[in-house]
From Swiss-Prot:
Pfam families: RNA_pol_A_bac, RNA_pol_A_CTD, RNA_pol_L. Residues 250-317 are annotated as: Alpha C-terminal domain (alpha-CTD). InterPro entries: DNA-dir_RNA_pol_insert (IPR011262), DNA-dir_RNA_pol_RpoA/D/Rpb3 (IPR011263), DNA-dir_RpoA (IPR011773), RBP11-like (IPR036603), RNAP_asu_C (IPR011260), RNApol_insert_sf (IPR036643). GO terms for molecular function: DNA binding; DNA-directed RNA polymerase activity; protein dimerization activity. The keyword Secreted does not apply. It catalyses: RNA(n) + a ribonucleoside 5'-triphosphate = RNA(n+1) + diphosphate. This is DNA-directed RNA polymerase subunit alpha. One of its GO terms (biological process) is DNA-templated transcription. Homodimer. The RNAP catalytic core consists of 2 alpha, 1 beta, 1 beta' and 1 omega subunit. When a sigma factor is associated with the core the holoenzyme is formed, which can initiate transcription. The keyword Nucleotidyltransferase applies. The N-terminal domain is essential for RNAP assembly and basal transcription, whereas the C-terminal domain is involved in interaction with transcriptional regulators and with upstream promoter elements.
Amino acid sequence: MKQFVRPEFILLKEGQDKNYGKFSVSPLERGFGITLGNAIRRTLLAATPGASVYAIKIAGATHEFTSIPGIIENVTKIILNIKQLVLKIDTSIYSDDEVVQLRIRSDIQGPIYAGDLDIPAGVEILNKDLLIATISEGGVLDLVLYAKNSRGYKTFKDNKNEKNIEPGMITIDSNYSPIIKVAYSVDSAKIGRAIDLEKLELEVTTDGSITAIDAISIASRILVAHLEFFIDLNREISVLEVIGTNQTDDKELDRTVEELDFTQRSLNCLKRAGINTLRELVSKNEDEIGSIRNLGRKSLKEIKDKVASLGLAFRQS
């Protein structure tokens, strides 16, 4: 049986706070780019666990349409503000569905921010400058937020069925997903003479409670867990027999730069820099290539395009 080529996962770009990442996976057999891309995207958006507030309790408020004397915002506006709160609840301290309470009681005139909330150990507020409410003269804000770890999106009606809902609590919509955006694209890739391969690129943006690369790892684990049932149907087939190593990699990387059809100017610059093989070329990062003497923008673009067309990438800085 023909073995599948083992792909390589490469970090192409990462935000300074690591909540954004762009990644590539290649080479993939034809059809697997969109298969994996769509599966990972849907799992990231729908099944990645996170933390959210699902109910609140405000002294003097019995429902979301209440106005509280001495508080500028009505309860509806306060709820809209709270729904923007970004939380991180430590799963090593709190079990799934274990409720944590964030509290504040203040009569100090002025704005109340998320950072003013009293929080228990193991809970972190990532957007502390988020406005919660504003106290005017003579006002008192007595507020409790109820939050937990879960996954997916639940409406305030769904949350009314939670077992720990008590009289006086107002349920709100809760979005537990830490994923803000996921996009993927599939391009052709080739290794040696094999031209019917694909490269999958993924872009992931999170709310900061999880890094982009951790989000992909968790989503992949969720997918694997769901596929284990199908693997168990026939234990005689080993995954290691299905996916083989890429035996063409070494030969491909040992190709000389003369074999890569560069223009004479680009070829001369690479040779003068001591770069004689494809392996030596991709062992450099993009800045090192760009700093080669007499290598202009046009030549740099030619080299970058050639490396990309081979389904490879420069070393990350």
